[in-house]
C-alpha cells in the first residue's frame, strides 16, 4: 500500500550528513529521517526545503524564491569530487520511472564534497508526489566506482506537506 498522495509541492530523501549552507533557516517539521525547513539563504533569498542525513551521507531538496527549478543536493564525507566536475545520476522512487540528471560537483561549507542538479518546474509536481508516496529511493552514479545509495523515505509525506506550506507562505 502506498502513502497518501501529496498535491502541489513537497519532497525529500533519507539516510544521509552535512550542515545546511544557511544559518538563517529553521526546521518546520520532522518525520522519520526527514526534516522540512524554511528561511533565508546566505544571500538573503527566501528558501524552503527538505533534507535527511546520516552515515556520512546527505540529501536535500531546496526551492528558492524566484527560481523556476528545484535544487537537489547530495553529499558524502567520503567523496573526492572536484568542484565543477560532472557526474551522471539515476534516481528511482520505488518502482517508478527513473529520474536521470547530470550533477555538478561543489563543496559544502564544512568542506565535504557534494553534487547538485535541478528539477524543472514542469516536472516538479511529479517529482514531489513520487517522493512523498514512495517508501525508498535508489540513487546510482553512472560511470563511477562510487557505491549507490538506498534512502528510506519514511516521513516524506509529512515533510512534503510542510514544505508545500512553506512554499505557499514564503515563496
Residue map of PLM features:
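Bacterial N-terminal signal peptides that target proteins for export
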Residues: 1-9
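Extended Gly/Ser/Thr-rich low-complexity repeat segments
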Residues: 58-68, 85-91, 120, 125-136
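An ectodomain-focused feature that recognizes extracytoplasmic/extracellular
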Residues: 24-85
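Hydrophobic alpha-helical targeting segments used for export or membrane insertion
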Residues: 9-12, 22
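N-terminal signal peptide c-region/cleavage motif recognized by signal peptidases
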Residues: 18-19
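Internal interaction segment
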Residues: 96-171
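Mid-length scaffold segments of soluble, non-membrane domains
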Residues: 72-104
Amino acid at each position: 500500500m502506498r502513502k497518501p498522495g501529496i498535491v502541489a509541492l513537497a519532497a525529500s530523501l533519507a539516510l544521509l550528513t552535512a550542515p545546511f549552507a544557511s544559518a538563517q533557516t529553521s526546521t518546520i517539521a520532522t518525520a522519520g529521517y526527514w526534516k522540512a525547513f524554511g528561511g533565508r539563504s546566505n544571500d538573503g533569498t527566501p528558501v524552503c526545503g527538505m533534507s535527511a542525513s546520516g552515515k556520512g551521507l546527505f540529501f536535500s531538496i531546496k526551492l528558492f524564491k524566484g527560481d523556476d527549478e528545484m535544487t537537489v543536493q547530495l553529499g558524502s564525507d567520503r567523496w573526492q569530487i572536484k568542484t565543477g566536475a560532472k557526474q551522471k545520476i539515476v534516481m528511482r522512487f520505488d518502482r517508478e520511472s527513473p529520474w536521470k540528471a547530470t550533477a555538478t560537483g561543489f563543496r559544502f561549507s564544512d568542506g565535504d564534497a557534494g553534487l547538485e542538479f535541478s528539477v524543472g518546474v514542469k516536472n516538479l509536481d511529479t517529482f514531489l508526489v513520487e517522493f512523498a508516496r514512495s517508501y525508498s529511493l535508489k540513487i546510482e552514479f553512472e560511470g563511477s566506482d562510487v557505491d549507490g545509495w538506498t534512502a528510506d523515505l519514511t516521513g516524506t509525506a509529512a515533510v512534503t506537506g510542510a514544505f508545500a506550506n512553506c512554499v505557499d507562505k514564503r515563496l
